[in-house]
Amino acid sequence: MITTVLTAILALAGPTQPSAGAAAPHVVFVCEHGAAKSLVATAYFNKMAAERGLAARATFRGVDPQDALSVRAVAGLKEDGLTIPDGRPTPIAASDVTAATHIFAIGCALPASATKSGKASSWDDVPDDQGYGPMRDAIVRHVRALLDTLR
């Protein structure tokens, strides 16, 4: 009886902070080429999570990766004063899906393993990196909303 009452009270209270032993959220951002949108999302997510004192971290991946990072995205991140995430465009792998607590497809279709994981969401309103500012602004809006759910 007491357990049932406590469970009901906790359910009404909503999400809580993870316990000290709980793994920090790991987000995987995925875009078509793993070179621009997912890179920008990763850079902003990691910066903003750290500013909020969250242990959550992100990585970037691609569905059909390019050989190098987008010159426009790298230049834009540098202008914004952000650290360029380490790495190069890499395909999303089964290990990424397993390690992730959240997977975000930014303007692309994810492989079946990611969509079936129950961890995937899509951000389909982010414009291409032809105009860095509009792309960044849409991504930052989504990242802020995501971080608000991880408090």
Residues of each region from the PLM?
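Bacterial N-terminal signal peptides
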Residues: 2-13
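A general, composition-driven signal for non-globular sequence regions
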Residues: 11-12, 31, 130
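Conserved active-site segments centered on acidic
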Residues: 16-92
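A short, aliphatic-rich alpha-helical micro-motif
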Residues: 97-98
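Phosphate-binding/catalytic loops
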Residues: 102, 108-151
